[in-house]
Regions:
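Residue-level signal for inorganic ion chemistry
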Residues: 29, 52, 105, 224, ...
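Structural helix-boundary/capping segments
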Residues: 35, 114, 165-170, 174-272, ...
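Short glycine/serine-rich loop/turn segments
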Residues: 72-214, 265-267, 316, 402-420
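Short helix-loop capping/hinge segments that flank enzyme active sites or metal/cofactor-binding pockets
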Residues: 72-92, 254-263, 316-387, 438-454
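Short alpha-helical scaffolding segments that buttress acidic/His motifs in well-ordered protein cores
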Residues: 25-29, 309-310, 356-364
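Serine-dependent amide/ester hydrolase catalytic core
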Residues: 12-13, 302-303, 326-434, 484-491
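An N-terminal boundary/leader segment
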Residues: 1-55, 65, 290-292, 365, ...
Length: 494
């Protein structure tokens, strides 16, 4: 098996056992990037090769000296381009931040560096994380490694495509309305969105502050649980960070779901769900039932109100958060302007893409004095009711099971021509963010075109262990599949 086909934890073990050096692991990933990046375009910025190899040597020395012995030491990782990395371009895939090099590093990324992971580069995304296809990036479209004519999903499409294509061993993404789970589903990888407040948002360039959460993207459940243990921490620099009682997630990696109560919302299986996706999800539920889980259908109310509530809240928060990008202190500044007001106007008009402008305008509208009560406050009340509906469901169930997306990856260009259809595609993921819950997408088959399908598992707040346990048990019945594109002759594992 090639180095780039190993899981992150397996590679970490081989490095520790001196079967593979950190430099060999990094070189294998760099060779893979050279081979496939021209087709996939998963990265916006790749770190300087010499610097990365030098870092690999430093980490190797620390491993040899016994200073680093964690499971991710020496493992190459990619970081979504909305997380600050000191001295390394952080663009949010937007023209307005085309020259922005932060003076500090995001807390989650710092935690990975402390764990000894080697950062290879920054991955492409929908501009400011606004989109579900990674087509709104100012730096080109990322393609799905399973079929280059299809999108990888979004907004963490670059991270998920990079993992699927073997261009890193794991990646960090962010999830505001499904931006880890949906592209993980489309790219056939595993993605975990933790409970809101579990991973520090310090250094994450904000889209919807009450919804954003950083999480791992990897080849399997073991990797995701291990990475989450490394990045989760209480951080007083983030006012929404939560001091959890328990930061252990890997103890849930047991193949035992006997007696686990799993609920399937009938509302998730109505009109608009692709029949092949439905079949794969119900087959996955059957597998868990055969392993001893108690699986039953139930009614989860208010699902149909999640999308309007989400877009009102997220866009309102975005219009406020993105007000700081005005060309004054950092980022892009328009040329040939007349006066300060004109500079603001030209900078923002030229710097932001169409989708970002659409959401800023929508957000400004719902926050305006005549409409604040009618839209924004109503959306907040709906959000509270959705959380209540989930609370009621979790009184009875340990895990909620359903699809991560209503379909497999659409063709490039299909979604941008119909933004409303793209928004509706988030139907199964959005309510998880509104309620602040943990959610996970695990590969559960492919459709007739060979495109991956993702199973979504949802847990109660701070109950990541339940979804990890269910996902791990299900995963034992399947083998990880990599797309053909992700296989090259170089970088054989010993």
């Amino acid at each position: 098996m090639k180095i780039t086909e190993l899981t992150a934890v397996t590679l970490g073990k081989k490095i520790k056992a001196k079967e593979i050096t950190v430099a060999e692991a990094v070189s294998a990933v760099l060779e893979q990037i050279e081979a496939v990046e021209g087709d996939v375009h998963a990265y916006v910025t790749l770190k300087d090769k010499e610097k990365v190899l030098k870092k690999a040597e430093e980490i190797q020395a620390k491993i040899d000296a016994g200073e680093l012995d964690g499971p991710l030491a020496g493992v190459p990782v990619a970081v979504k381009d909305n997380m600050c990395t000191e001295g390394v371009l952080t663009t949010c895939s937007s023209k307005i931040l085309s020259n922005f090099k932060p003076t500090y590093t995001a807390e989650a990324v710092k935690n990975l560096e402390k764990a000894g992971a080697v950062i290879i580069g920054k991955t492409n995304m929908d501009e400011f994380a606004m989109g579900s296809t990674t087509e709104t990036s100012a730096y080109g479209v990322t393609r799905n490694p399973w079929n280059l004519e299809h999108v990888p999903g979004g907004s963490s499409g670059g991270s998920c495509a990079a993992v699927a294509a073997g261009e890193c061993l794991f990646a960090l993404g962010s999830d505001t309305g499904g931006s880890i789970r949906q592209p993980s589903s489309f790219c056939g990888v595993t993605g975990l969105k933790p409970t809101y407040g579990t991973v520090s948002r310090y250094g994450l360039i904000a889209y919807g502050s009450s919804l954003d959460q950083i999480g791992p993207v990897a080849k399997d459940v073991t990797d995701c649980a291990t990475i989450l243990e490394a990045i989760a921490s209480y951080d007083k620099k983030d006012s929404t960070s939560v001091k959890r009682e328990d930061y252990d997630f890997t103890s849930a990696l047991v193949d035992d779901v006997k007696g686990m109560r799993i609920g399937i919302p009938r509302d998730y299986f109505g009109e608009g769900l692709d029949p092949e996706v439905k079949e794969a999800i119900l087959a996955a539920a059957k597998v868990l039932e055969e392993k001893g889980a108690i699986v039953e259908e139930f009614d989860l109310s208010l699902v149909e109100y999640a999308i309007p509530a989400y877009y009102v809240i997220a866009c309102a928060e975005a219009s406020s958060n993105l007000a700081r990008f005005d060309g004054v202190k950092y980022g892009y500044r328009a040329k040939d302007y007349e006066g300060l007001h004109n500079m603001y106007k030209k900078t923002r008009s030229e710097g932001f893409g169409a989708e970002v402008k659409r959401r800023i305008i929508l957000g400004s509208f719902v926050l305006s004095s005549g409409y604040y009560d009618a839209y924004y406050l109503k959306a907040l009340r709906t959000k509270a009711l959705i959380k209540k509906a989930f609370d009621k469901a979790f009184d009875k169930y340990d895990v909620i099971l359903g699809p991560a997306a209503p379909n497999t990856a659409p063709k490039i260009g299909d979604s941008l021509s119909d933004p409303l259809k793209m928004y509706l595609g988030d139907i199964y993921t959005i309510s998880v963010n509104l309620a602040g819950l943990p959610g996970m997408s695990v590969p559960c088959g492919r459709d007739a075109k060979g495109l991956p399908i993702g199973l979504q598992l949802i847990g109660d707040c701070f109950k990541e262990k339940n979804i990890i346990r269910a996902a791990y048990a299900y995963e034992q019945t399947r083998k990880y599949e990599a797309p053909k594109l992700a296989k090259t002759a170089e970088g054989e594992a010993k």
